[in-house]
Amino acid sequence: MSNQHTLLTSNLLPVGSNISTWWNFGSMLLTCLIMQILTGFFLAIHYTANINLAFSSVIHITRDVPYGWIMQNLHAIGASMFFICIYIHIARGLYYGLYLNKEVWLSGTTLLITLMATAFFGYVLPWGQMSFWAATVITNLLTAIPHLGTVLTTWLWGGFSINDPTLTRFFALHFILPFAIISLSSIHIILLHNEGSNNPLGTNSDIDKIPFHPYHSYKDMLMITIMVTLLFIILSFLPNLLNDPENFSKANPLITPQHIKPEWYFLFAYGILRSIPNKLGGTMALTMSIMILMTTPFTHTSHTRSMIFRPLSQTMFWTLIVTFIMITWTATKPVEPPFITISQTTTVFYFSFFIMTPLLGWTENKIMMMKN
């Protein structure tokens, strides 16, 4: 056995033999991150962060640069794949009680916030119609902050409206934040290696562990291969599946799109924002839709870690999944009845998961005690 192989295998923790496919999404996320950084680097070489040239430079990349269309589409579709994997990764954590490993969960939530900021800045860079107006709407939310809001917005914009300085700083932030994501990912993985992975049963894995390599590493490779295959199928046959048609027009501050919306992976948060008629209230709800994930390690009441043996909590979990899909769907629709009512109802359901789950955990404990 080579020295390199010994070094690799000696640093890989043994893992519980019963972990399922849901445990493969961490390695898939790492693959997405590497792919995004590589494609992003090649795109940055040809991109021009200027409001008069940005849109043309993206067209130049797709038309004139050799394999530029592959790089551009890989980067755009790869971002969607990144968010699909991260949402499944979070759902797995909620279902199997992985949030009880507090340090790993809190570092992961910080990673999610950084990732969302990076994706938002990236969406603005092509300087299409939807890029411009989505940036205007979202950055304008800062004005809801009492006393400091207007000053913060002007500081972020680099002027009194979204203009050339805004695009320049958004490009700088979009370029630098992935390095912060690499650092946070390293911290996330190091913290995970303190205790090691949990398993679907939520029990201690020490009695039944197997080497990570080759058993789980090959399993990871299978899922990564499936993900990359799916990515290239979309890239080859449906490259504009996840794009907004409005973004094929250059940004025009004088023409407002009929329906302003961000990328699909932000629609659940945008739907929560729109469901509240008050600007400050909507901004707070938008922030809380992500930040509330940080409360889960401190509100767990059940004696059982995983939801696998808790039918009441399972019902709440699947209600949350359906709610997430419903909010995403309603956020694509105009602000008019019945979508306003649906949006408000689903927002209540979304937040009720984080309130009801601790109460259900307490109820389940009582039922178990009665049976004993």
UniProtKB/Swiss-Prot annotation:
Subcellular location(s): the record lists: Mitochondrion inner membrane
Major subcellular location class: mitochondrion
Annotated residues for binding of a ubiquinone: H193
Q: Which GO terms describe its cellular component?
A: mitochondrial inner membrane; respiratory chain complex III
List the disulfide bonds in this chain: none
Q: How is the cofactor bound?
A: Binds 2 heme b groups non-covalently.
Q: A GO term (biological process) for this protein?
A: mitochondrial electron transport, ubiquinol to cytochrome c
Protein topology in the membrane: Multi-pass membrane protein
Gene3D superfamilies according to UniProt: Cytochrome Bc1 Complex, Chain C (1.20.810.10)
Q: List the CDD domains hit by this protein, alphabetically.
A: cytochrome_b_C, Cytochrome_b_N
Name the cofactor(s) required for activity, per the record.
heme b
Going by the UniProt record, its keywords in alphabetical order are: Electron transport, Heme, Iron, Membrane, Metal-binding, Mitochondrion, Mitochondrion inner membrane, Respiratory chain, Transmembrane, Transmembrane helix, Transport, Ubiquinone
Molecular-function GO terms, alphabetical: metal ion binding; ubiquinol-cytochrome-c reductase activity
Q: Where does heme b b562 bind?
A: H75, H174
Q: Does the keyword Oxidoreductase apply?
A: no
Q: Which residues cross the membrane?
A: 25-45, 69-90, 105-125, 170-190, 218-238, 280-300, 312-332, 339-358
Which positions are annotated as binding heme b b566? Answer: H89, H188
What is this protein for, i.e. what is its function?
Component of the ubiquinol-cytochrome c reductase complex (complex III or cytochrome b-c1 complex) that is part of the mitochondrial respiratory chain. The b-c1 complex mediates electron transfer from ubiquinol to cytochrome c. Contributes to the generation of a proton gradient across the mitochondrial membrane that is then used for ATP synthesis.
- Extra notes? Heme 1 (or BL or b562) is low-potential and absorbs at about 562 nm, and heme 2 (or BH or b566) is high-potential and absorbs at about 566 nm.
Database matches in PANTHER family: CYTOCHROME B
Quote the subunit structure annotation: The cytochrome bc1 complex contains 3 respiratory subunits (MT-CYB, CYC1 and UQCRFS1), 2 core proteins (UQCRC1 and UQCRC2) and probably 6 low-molecular weight proteins.
By sequence similarity, the record places it as follows:
Belongs to the cytochrome b family.
Q: What is this protein called?
A: Cytochrome b
Lineage, uppermost ranks? Eukaryota, Metazoa, Chordata, Craniata, Vertebrata
